[in-house]
A protein has these predicted regions:
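Hydrophobic/basic alpha-helical segments
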Residues: 1-189
Length: 189
């Protein structure tokens, strides 16, 4: 899929919704932005994993504008504290969050079968105790020869998952996992 086609459509729709909200409701509620803008930003965003920041910057600008609308802050105010106060991750971290949430569902058998077929858990064949034995590690697929192949879910998901600390991987519930993961991603920035 040509990246510019996806970006043009996705960015255009999110920008239209943002413009509609901006014209009609100054200081709009966060709920409206989530309903009309965030849904377009999150639509198929796992396809955007591994793209350069230059491709993600239009989506990030839309998110920044939405955050400024909600908080009624000026255009030139620094955006990081605003996003943090709203508990919003930047676009590249949102993409990582969504991918890791899918992997959590895969490792706990609550994802559809077609997703479970894309990644597999590493079997603990050793009888020795290893630090990594308490965590669920995923097997990396064969290395591809293209950048597009390296961005595939089956390639990027194990890389992201295996970098997570074990206490996040072994979260007892999906809500706990989301909270721990969001905190972890906020602290990486």
């Amino acid at each position: 899929m040509e990246p510019s086609l996806f970006y043009n459509h996705s960015t255009k729709k999110a920008n239209q919704m943002l413009g509609m909200i901006w014209c009609n409701l100054r200081g709009c509620s966060e709920r409206l932005v989530h309903a009309f803008v965030s849904s377009h930003l999150d639509y198929c965003n796992s396809l955007l994993a591994g793209l350069p920041i230059s491709y993600l910057s239009p989506l990030q600008r839309i998110q920044n504008t939405a955050a400024r609308m909600i908080t009624l802050t000026r255009k030139h105010d620094h955006i990081s504290p605003i996003l943090r106060s709203l508990h919003w991750l930047p676009v590249h971290s949102r993409i990582t969050f969504k991918i890791l949430l899918l992997v959590y569902k895969i490792t706990h058998n609550i994802a559809p079968q077609y997703l479970q077929d894309l990644v597999s858990l590493r079997a603990s064949s050793s009888t020795r105790f290893l630090r990594s034995s308490s965590s669920m590690q995923l097997i990396h697929g064969p290395r591809t020869k293209t950048r597009y192949g390296d961005r595939a879910f089956s390639s990027i998901a194990p890389k992201l998952w295996n970098r997570l600390p074990p206490h996040i991987q072994n979260a007892p519930s999906i809500e706990t996992f989301k909270n721990l993961l969001k905190t972890y991603l906020f602290n990486l920035q």
